[in-house]
């Protein structure tokens, strides 16, 4: 990415990755401006159940602490920090659709929608309104390769921290004027840079909760928004009732914890859900979780090669090793994926992300 632009906006989250990104940008650009997104309000959003911790400021939600950390980072770098309230937009564009998906028996991924509609959508647009000629940066572990003036999303140097799975549903035009400062850095290097600058965030653990909401006991958290609806748990093969559950929307394919099946000798997994009858089906046979073919709908093309490759790499979840598969185009935005080796725990509502063999992201589709 050219550094002709004088101004770059960086999404400052209060974590180590965005902090080090801001530091690196400060060395390249005349003006760096931090932007912090406020996307969640516990009281306004009736967020009472499922908190993992309680502190003096915000119980369970890290938004308050994250903003304080972002301010410290901005002050230490001598850069301006803007706080942007996107609570209503996040609720309408990310959170409510997530709840509706759960009601349909799906397993949605709110982080993917957040990147498309909020971070690289509304926040990016907000920054362009302030300065139309500016660049936009985040602390994602991802890479942009410019080919024929087109930004192509690619796997970064630190493949263990690769976050392209969460970015693959962003529209390709949204990556114009976007840079990822950590593209060629390992996480250990990022933490060491933070330690050299005596930043508290140097050893801050990576966030694993819902995007901008924080750590939660997930099924309890969902009970803020979805009713308990008792139903039967049945054996997949015999169809015999073996227990009961609180509602099929609280469970996902492959889940083995929280099933209350302590009396059974073998470990069981969720293999199917019937949203109409509110029945949950489990099995102790992992073979029931394997699939060789999946369909991807609403496919978002980030890169359309002149000829579709005979083989692609596919992820059906973050941090999964990409699997070799064959690709069949059913329509412009519907694909059939056939894996070389069976994959486990495919959940409808998640995303399948495709890559070329040389690690360029083709895009993402809904499973």
Swiss-Prot record:
Supply the enzyme class, top level.
transferase
Query: What does the UniProt keyword field contain?
Result: ATP-binding, Cytoplasm, Disulfide bond, Nucleotide-binding, RNA-binding, Transferase, tRNA processing, tRNA-binding
| Keyword Transcription recorded | no
Q: Where is this region: Interaction with tRNA?
A: 161-163
Q: Which GO terms describe its cellular component?
A: cytoplasm
InterPro entries found in the cross-reference section: MnmA-like, MnmA-like_C, MnmA-like_central, MnmA-like_central_sf, Rossmann-like_a/b/a_fold
**What name does the UniProt record give this protein?**
tRNA-specific 2-thiouridylase MnmA
Annotated source species = Mycoplasma genitalium (strain ATCC 33530 / DSM 19775 / NCTC 10195 / G37) (Mycoplasmoides genitalium)
């Amino acid at each position: 990415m050219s550094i002709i632009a004088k101004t770059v906006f960086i999404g400052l989250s209060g974590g180590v990755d965005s902090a080090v990104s801001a530091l690196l940008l400060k060395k390249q650009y005349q003006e760096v401006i931090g932007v912090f997104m406020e996307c969640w309000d516990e009281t306004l959003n009736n967020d009472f159940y499922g908190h993992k911790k309680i502190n003096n400021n915000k119980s369970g939600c890290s938004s308050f602490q994250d903003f304080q950390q972002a301010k410290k980072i901005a002050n230490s770098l001598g850069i301006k920090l803007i706080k942007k309230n996107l609570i209503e937009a996040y609720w309408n564009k990310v959170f409510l659709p997530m709840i509706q998906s759960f009601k349909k028996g799906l397993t949605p991924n709110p982080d993917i929608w957040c990147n498309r509609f909020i971070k690289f959508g509304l926040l990016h647009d907000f920054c362009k309104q302030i300065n139309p000629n500016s660049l936009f940066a985040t602390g994602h572990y991802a890479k942009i390769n410019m080919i024929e003036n087109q930004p192509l999303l690619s796997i970064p140097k630190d493949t263990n921290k690769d976050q392209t799975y969460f970015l693959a549903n962003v529209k390709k035009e949204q990556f114009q004027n976007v840079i990822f400062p950590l593209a060629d850095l390992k996480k250990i290097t990022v933490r060491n840079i933070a330690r050299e600058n005596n930043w508290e965030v140097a050893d801050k653990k990576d966030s694993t909760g819902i995007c901008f909401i924080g750590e939660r006991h997930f099924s309890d958290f969902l009970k803020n928004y979805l009713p308990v609806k008792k139903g039967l748990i049945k054996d997949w093969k015999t169809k015999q009732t073996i227990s009961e559950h609180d509602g099929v929307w609280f469970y996902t394919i492959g889940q083995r914890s929280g099933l209350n099946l302590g009396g059974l000798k073998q470990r069981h997994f969720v293999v199917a859900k019937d949203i109409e009858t509110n029945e949950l089906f489990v099995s102790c046979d992992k073979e029931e979780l394997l699939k060789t073919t999946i369909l991807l709908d609403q496919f978002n093309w980030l890169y359309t090669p002149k000829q579709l490759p005979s083989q692609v790499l596919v992820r059906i979840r973050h941090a999964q090793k990409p699997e070799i598969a064959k690709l069949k185009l059913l329509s412009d935005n519907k694909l059939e994926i056939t894996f070389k080796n069976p994959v486990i725990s495919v959940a409808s509502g998640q995303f399948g992300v495709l890559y070329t063999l040389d690690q360029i992201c083709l895009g993402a589709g809904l499973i």
